[in-house]
Swiss-Prot record:
Gene, per the UniProt record: DEGS1
Tissue: Ubiquitous.
PTM (free text): Myristoylation can target the enzyme to the mitochondria leading to an increase in ceramide levels.
Protein name as it appears in the record: Sphingolipid delta(4)-desaturase DES1
Lipidation (N-myristoyl glycine): G2
Transmembrane segments: 41-61, 68-88, 102-122, 152-172, 184-204, 209-229
Disorder noted: Leukodystrophy, hypomyelinating, 18: An autosomal recessive disorder characterized by hypomyelinating leukodystrophy with progressive atrophy of the corpus callosum, thalami and cerebellum, and peripheral neuropathy. Clinical features include very poor psychomotor development, dystonia, severe spasticity, seizures, and failure to thrive.
Summary of subunit composition and partner proteins: Interacts with RLBP1; the interaction increases synthesis of chromophore-precursors by DEGS1.
Keywords from the UniProt entry: Disease variant, Endoplasmic reticulum, Fatty acid biosynthesis, Fatty acid metabolism, Isomerase, Leukodystrophy, Lipid biosynthesis, Lipid metabolism, Lipoprotein, Membrane, Mitochondrion, Myristate, Oxidoreductase, Phosphoprotein, Transmembrane, Transmembrane helix
Native source organism of the sequence: Homo sapiens
Ranges spanned by the short sequence motif Histidine box-2, renumbered to the chain: 128-132
Length: 323
């Protein structure tokens, strides 16, 4: 657990990301894929039910012993809250109401944010669009770890701690890599979230509030679903920047595992990404992919060739249009 990883820097590349070229090729060959570029109204009802489910859980845990509060937060609440962050990912791509009702998606994202306990839906949308446009761009893509993360988390034990602390790194990394001025929507998101948290504490008590926050922190840290954070873009095979996952946890995560398909077609809702793979099978079936996020987490910690430095990175090119 104490041996150091062999990598001491990111994988600097001087080619463009592969997704734009593959998208053009696939659309030229299979123009029917354009019919999948439409919102998924089922998202609305699924998310409403998820919020109501967590509200019910808040009520149930208010009188439980603390050990059951924490157990419930990890065994149940973490799955709901991590899934909700991926619902917010869908909303960030306007998958709920479509591009023509962009603001409806922003308000709905704030609603979906409520049971997570920490305001982030508006900020996530801003940074996530940069991640798609400028994948791996130095100083722009905040999905890339900082140099400190790559330098410090360089043993199996430290990488294990890094996995546990993932939600904190995702929360604070943008402040160091690509800080942005606060927008009025972020202020509204924060006020709405803090008000909701206060109401939960006032009407249901401290145990419900702790359950909500613990569900988010535990669910985004050392949790099977959190394998997607590493599986998506960490370079387990040299030269491959994005990886898909085709295992059963896609059922809980709005098909976020179909990540090559998602980066090729970010305006297609997760529900339809398996159809993209089916239609253009020759483009995806031979790409390296995963069937277990748990194995991804294990390999990340135990493999001495993999670390937070295992990301492909690019220097900025020309003038960038940021969110």
């Amino acid at each position: 657990m104490g041996s150091r990883v062999s990598r001491e820097d990111f994988e600097w590349v001087y080619t463009d990301q592969p997704h734009a070229d593959r998208r053009r090729e696939i659309l030229a060959k299979y123009p029917e894929i354009k019919s999948l570029m439409k919102p998924d109204p089922n998202l609305i009802w699924i998310i409403i039910m998820m919020v109501l489910t967590q509200l019910g859980a808040f009520y149930i845990v208010k009188d439980l012993d603390w050990k059951w509060v924490i157990f419930g937060a990890y065994a149940f609440g973490s799955c709901i809250n991590h899934s909700m962050t991926l619902a917010i990912h869908e909303i960030a791509h306007n998958a709920a109401f479509g591009n023509c009702k962009a603001m409806w998606n922003r308000w709905f994202g704030m609603f979906a944010n409520l049971p997570i306990g920490i305001p982030y839906s508006i900020s996530f949308k801003r940074y996530h669009m940069d991640h798609h446009r400028y994948l791996g761009a130095d100083g722009v893509d905040v999905d890339i770890p900082t140099d400190f993360e790559g330098w410090f988390f360089c043993t199996a034990f430290r990488k294990f701690i890094w996995v546990i602390l993932q939600p904190l790194f995702y929360a604070f990394r943008p402040l160091f890599i690509n800080p942005k001025p606060i927008t009025y929507l972020e202020v509204i998101n924060t006020v709405a979230q803090v008000t909701f948290d206060i109401l939960i504490y006032y009407f249901l008590g401290i145990k419900s509030l702790v359950y909500m926050l613990a569900a988010s922190l535990l669910g985004l840290g050392l949790h099977p679903i959190s394998g997607h954070f590493i599986a998506e873009h960490y370079m387990f095979l040299k030269g491959h920047e994005t990886y898909s996952y085709y295992g059963p946890l896609n059922l809980l995560t709005f098909n976020v595992g179909y990540h090559n398909e998602h980066h090729d077609f970010p305006n297609i809702p997760g529900k339809s990404l398996p159809l993209v793979r089916k239609i253009a099978a020759e483009y995806y079936d031979n790409l390296p992919h995963y069937n277990s996020w748990i194995k991804v987490l294990y390999d990340f910690v135990m493999d001495d060739t993999i670390s937070p430095y295992s990301r492909m990175k690019r220097h900025q090119k020309g003038e960038m249009v940021l969110e």
